[in-house]
Amino acid sequence: MPKSAVWGLCGHFNPAMPYSMQDLWNMGVKTDRDRLTKPYIRSNFLGDVFGVDTDEAVKTFLNTNDNYIYWFKPEFDTQMKVQEYFNALMAKQGGNLTENQQNIKNGLMYLHCEVLFVEDQKNPDLLHPRIALYQSHSYNELYDDQKEVMMRIHNDYFYHRHNEFWRASAMRKLPTLTGATNMLVCGEDLGMVPACVPDVMHELEILSLEIQRMPKDPNVEFAHPADAPYMSVCTTGTHDTSPLREWWEEDRETTQHFFNNQMGWWGEAPETMSAEIAEFIINQHMYSPAMWVILPLQDWLAIDENVRLADPKAERINIPSNPRHFWKYRMHLTVEELLSNDEFNKHVRNLTARRF
């Protein structure tokens, strides 16, 4: 990410193989560099971005000559400048923004991401497609033939162009790292994974990471712990995901699908995760064929309503989408309290005994 950016959408892979403008023209792009890299801001969608705060946002932060094409005022022409402006405003107001101010801030951050390509940080003459560029107004207002070109370039960059490049890079570095220790190595192979990754991990005997709510098969809504490969670590979540109890309350529709289809329970899913449900999910993991089942402490505590923390949101460790998030989670029990809770410890031992 450039130092002027706050959101990850403005970043790019490193190391990577970016494109020159000549490369892009040769691939069918029919526009200039500014159309690709400058925030695309037009009056016809500003209302969608700012809602009732549109007039205030335009007046304070944007310039225009014709009330159709807009660009940022110099003092707000990066996400970091926007961030600093609202940080100063928060300080004046006792540490908080009003709902309208937060809405404007989010809209401005979004508009800074209204680009199709981002400049390479080492060589600004080279360009990287913005991740998910097809979700931008800039893309939607292209002619159909240019949309096809952009999608072809986007998919080439993110799914094909780097495969051999990254494989070669991995094979130069990873064998030294894995060979330097007798410990088992686990790779965080979640999300958008290049096609070369599974083969490299298999060749170097690096364990995969399997999470039930983050399936690697795009055709299923949830993975099942029973389907995890032996060479893997199976878990309910990581420090970068919400703990089970918080996840249960995030999306009602997803929770209902999990309750009926993954758990096989009838009726309407409860609004909060009971200890019984938490134990059911953990029990599924205990029977996984994965070499390792390693669960977050918060999810173990969830099986006992007398032990777990009252507020599920207070159990969250990290929020990757928020670069300013402060890691402050600590177990609410002392180690001595945990060790002396014979009933809870017996409960955990009974569950883990099913692994053997």
Model-derived features: positions:
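Catalytic cores of glycan-processing enzymes that make or break glycosidic bonds
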Residues: 1-356
